[in-house]
């Protein structure tokens, strides 16, 4: 399922690739510029928004991955909203990929600005660039998304504990490696293997193995780095490898 702003250009291309039946369009009501593309026009899954902030909420709320392409102020607004929500734990974890045309420098220049004006001045954490991937290669972009769900499935909080659902069970040695490398993100205790907690009895992911930890809810870049480390552990079967949307 693909969700776009519902307009032309790259938004229409997303709908063409997914097909009308697998597309949502979240259009914005403007007196100029933004018209629904012919793929989604007239479809009940085309939704019109008066305000940008509610549109952004719906774009992100159910998304399992975000792909951003070069654009104007609206694109920058959506990009920084996505980064802010990811950095503060209000959204995700999900893969966020900034995709340019081959040889393009739109996102590379953006990334250089982030490094110079934010990262080097201590306005964001050194790990925050781990929240996103910048590329002009579609293969790299696709791999960044699929690789994010190689072993990691999804996560939620149960009280103060972060529960990370996995597609395969990790070994004790692998969990020990995570504790050795990521103890800095813990408030207390250790990263531990677990089955579903009692509060998850009705969860559709009940049978999946889990990791449970008291995450400090601050170092989200480090959490993304830990997810990357988890995805380098083990090799799920083709049946286990499917995206969370395809349960």
Residue ranges: model-predicted function:
Residues 11-14, 104-117:
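Glycine-rich, charge-decorated loop segments at or immediately adjacent to ligand/cofactor-binding or catalytic sites
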Residues 22-34, 69, 83-110, 126-127:
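Short, acidic/small-residue loops that bind anionic groups at enzyme active sites
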């Amino acid at each position: 399922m693909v969700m776009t702003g519902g307009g032309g250009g790259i938004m229409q291309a997303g709908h063409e690739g997914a097909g009308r039946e697998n597309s949502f369009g979240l259009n914005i009501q403007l007196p100029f510029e933004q018209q629904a593309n012919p793929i989604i026009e007239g479809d009940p899954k085309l939704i019109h928004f008066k305000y940008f902030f509610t549109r952004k909420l719906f774009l992100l709320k159910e998304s399992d991955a975000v792909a951003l392409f070069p654009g104007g102020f609206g694109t920058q607004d959506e990009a920084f909203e996505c980064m802010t929500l990811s950095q503060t734990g209000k959204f995700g974890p999900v893969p966020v990929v900034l995709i340019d045309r081959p040889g393009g420098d739109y996102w590379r220049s953006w990334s250089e600005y982030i490094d110079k004006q934010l990262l080097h001045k201590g306005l964001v954490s050194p790990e925050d660039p781990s929240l996103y991937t910048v590329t002009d290669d579609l293969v790299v972009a696709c791999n960044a998304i699929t690789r994010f769900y190689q072993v990691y499935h999804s996560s939620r909080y149960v009280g103060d504990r972060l529960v990370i659902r996995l597609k395969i069970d990790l070994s004790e040695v692998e969990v020990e490696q995570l504790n050795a490398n990521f103890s800095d993100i813990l408030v207390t205790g250790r990263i531990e293997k677990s089955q579903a907690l009692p509060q998850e009895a009705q969860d559709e992911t009940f049978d999946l193995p889990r990791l449970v930890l008291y995450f400090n809810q601050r170092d989200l870049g480090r959490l993304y780095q830990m997810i990357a480390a988890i995805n380098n552990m083990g090799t799920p079967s083709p049946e286990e490898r499917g995206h969370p949307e395809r349960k």
